[in-house]
Amino acid sequence: MLLLGLLLLTSALAGQRTGTRAESNLSSKLQLSSDKEQNGVQDPRHERVVTISGNGSIHSPKFPHTYPRNMVLVWRLVAVDENVRIQLTFDERFGLEDPEDDICKYDFVEVEEPSDGSVLGRWCGSGTVPGKQTSKGNHIRIRFVSDEYFPSEPGFCIHYSIIMPQVTETTSPSVLPPSSLSLDLLNNAVTAFSTLEELIRYLEPDRWQVDLDSLYKPTWQLLGKAFLYGKKSKVVNLNLLKEEVKLYSCTPRNFSVSIREELKRTDTIFWPGCLLVKRCGGNCACCLHNCNECQCVPRKVTKKYHEVLQLRPKTGVKGLHKSLTDVALEHHEECDCVCRGNAGG
């Protein structure tokens, strides 16, 4: 009887130890799974910093063969030059565990932009090779995760390369001072500026603000004459199709012209150098006679004034005289088709 009691007590203690061990093993698996979820790109224990100055590659372990199971690997590529970017190109031999419901849940490779933490992409399966990825700065992060089931082959290989910064053009169209340029070369340099302030800074770097302000001081001259001609209101009639043909056939339309060429002035520079004017254009497809013998010509021409900056060489000394002036350019108000042997189309 005593022996039977000892056997029962020993069995109970053994069962308790077995249950404790099983529970401990289960807790360890859960803890491992939890750690695996947290060991992302933010966990420095799994991150390997790779300093690069040229081309190279990284790949899954044992590439191009079956990669190991239950892994988390992170590479952070850092270019030596801070002004460059990094481009990633995936090898055509790409294959990881297939996605589930089009989501890469188990085995995948992921690329992250460290500057803002955004994920550029996550890929798995073997159907399509991922496209090229480019960093915003001089570093980029790559993460590879495999779970404990169904490893695949060949894994992945990523080739990295350095993208040099693009050379930006200088804001000044000419590095030479205005006094060293001929008038034609200076005209080309002046035309390249996009704002009046940039132009005056180039012409007078030491006193550009004074010169700019003096251009707009009130004078006794009437500057900036702008004569606007009202457009004739269109009368709607039943023959709408014919009116549309007239509208887009021989009609006044915008043309850009060079002021120097229009005024035949080679001794002066104007800014802006080109302006929009109305000039007759289009075809004469609906003329009454042979249309090949018809030409679209202006029927009414007017002069309109445009205020521009005028630059003229000073007499006897170096430098340019700067002033706002009005230039008169021809505008075509009305057009007509003139055919050979007939006054109208």
From Swiss-Prot:
PROSITE patterns: CUB, PDGF_2. Mainly expressed in kidney, testis, liver, heart and brain (at protein level). Highly expressed in airway epithelium, interstitial cells and alveolar macrophages in the lung of mice overexpressing IL13. Expressed in the ovaries. Proteolytic removal of the N-terminal CUB domain releasing the core domain is necessary for unmasking the receptor-binding epitopes of the core domain. Cleavage after basic residues in the hinge region (region connecting the CUB and growth factor domains) gives rise to the receptor-binding form. Cleaved by PLAT and PLG. Sumoylated by SUMO1. One of its GO terms (cellular component) is extracellular space. Disruption phenotype: Perinatal lethality. Mice have feeding and respiratory difficulties due to a complete cleft of the secondary palate. However, they have reduction of renal fibrogenesis. Mice lacking both PDGFA and PDGFC develop a cleft face, subepidermal blistering, deficiency of renal cortex mesenchyme, spina bifida and skeletal and vascular defects. Keywords: Cell membrane, Cleavage on pair of basic residues, Cytoplasm, Developmental protein, Disulfide bond, Glycoprotein, Growth factor, Membrane, Mitogen, Nucleus, Secreted, Signal, Ubl conjugation. Residues 34-45 have a biased composition (Basic and acidic residues). Homodimer; disulfide-linked. Interacts with PDGFRA homodimers, and with heterodimers formed by PDGFRA and PDGFRB. Interacts (via CUB domain) with PLAT (via kringle domain). It is linked to Involved in the development of myocarditis and subsequent fibrosis in the experimental model of coxsackievirus B3-induced chronic myocarditis. This is Platelet-derived growth factor C.
